[in-house]
Amino acid sequence: MIRIPGYEHKRIAVMGLGVAGLPTVRALMASGAHVLAWDDGAESRNKAAAEGIPVVDLLSADWDGIDTLVLSPGIPHTFPKPHPVAERARKADAQIVCDVDLLGRAQPDAIYVGITGTNGKSTTTALIAHILASAGKTIEVGGNLGPPVLAFAPLGKNGIYVLEMSSYQLERTFSISFDVAVLLNVSPNHIDRHGDLAGYVAAKTRIFAGNRKKKTAVIGADDEETRRVADTLADRMHIVRVTREKPGPGMVGAEGTRLVDRTGDAPRIVLDLKDAPDLPGRHNAQNAAAAYAATRALGVAPEAIAAAMKTYRSLPHRLERVATVEGVTYVNDSKATSPEATVWALTSYDKVIWIAGGLSKEVGYDALIPYLPKIAHAFLIGKAAGEIAAFLGKHGIPATASETLERAVPAAHALATSAAGARVVLLSPACASFDQYHSFEKRGDDFRAHVKKLGAGA
């Protein structure tokens, strides 16, 4: 647990007692702070009270002497409408922060690596952490990826905190100047929370704020917004541009399946990504390039980075190889809750049997059209099954309405093991999970369980 110096007897308000909120309260109380904690949910309040945490309605509380509100990232303080507690904090002239800001206050001498972007940040965060750990560095990894940062161990001067940073966290973090800051990509997302695309981009680019003297910015070069950001920062810090395509001078990227470093006098082939089986697809080429650039900036040798990438294992529910049963590989990409996310999954394989469906995001499926030839057959689940079947039918892709994963997985296996079957079964739903599951994680766990049954019967 992190203890925060200088907080003894200070009055601190904490709003939101979930995954990050409870560890925040525990750390503050262990630091001697007088905490006033609240959550809009009675269950969360009761859980906190059972731990002996002082639960106080922050709307009616006395804010005299409170100069900080630690607000859960999921609770808005600006758009689309500020939470009443955030408005109360403003009236009291209290600074609104998140738990990551408190980590920076508690561990000012540590090394910080921050990773953000619309897509790919969890994989890149996990890959950077794996490379650093494999190289013998003392690290903690978490943030938006989890676990909560105030549950970390204190690492001190030579320790490295590897933090996935959401736009929500970045707009409430002021105490950290990242030694290595990674921005992978930007596309419209969370616009309701940031007002417009410009507000979203502004939140993302806060990852480059601060005044560390030896700051490295690793920035994706594959979309217009990030290229503009790189150009803006070029005269302020050292920038390494990364791409999933062939890299130009000064860049890291991919030539075919080879990861290539062109930041030196001569191009260096780092490794063939075919030898990193849990980093499939063009999108992972950019993730690998970013992880390489970030860890090189921290002094890890290219050979050590290549060796670590070969042993990296994918995060759960993100192109996760679950098992191979009777020669058929099962891939869990339950995190793909939109058609755009499923595009990346389809680009990773030559031919798949696709399991998709759930609760439609109501954005249409046209983004998938260029990749439909990769689908040998689709097995569809959930409320969106009919909608997706109609879309696929217009493009000549055969589909079966299976309704549930319990039916879809064995049906997909039967087809995959036939003479004409594709040898990859891909769960990449292109839909939210909430019609059948509480979360995409539960959906992915269910997929794993049904695949395990196949193996038991093989």
Report the location of each language-model feature.
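Phosphate-binding loop of NTP-binding sites
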Residues: 63-64, 73, 77-221, 225-237, ...
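Nucleotide phosphate-binding/pyrophosphate-handling subdomain across enzymes
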Residues: 3-11, 22-31, 271-375
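Residues in the short beta-alpha loop(s) of Rossmann-like NAD(P)-binding domains
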Residues: 18, 41, 145, 222-223, ...
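C-terminal helical cap/extension that packs against the catalytic core
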Residues: 365-423, 458
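Beta-strand->loop->alpha-helix junctions that form or flank phosphate-binding loops
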Residues: 39, 57-59, 97-102, 140, ...
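Short beta-strand "acidic-cap" motif of Rossmann-like dinucleotide-binding folds
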Residues: 34-39, 140-141, 162, 241, ...
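Short internal beta-strands
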Residues: 33-40, 217-221, 355-356, 373-384
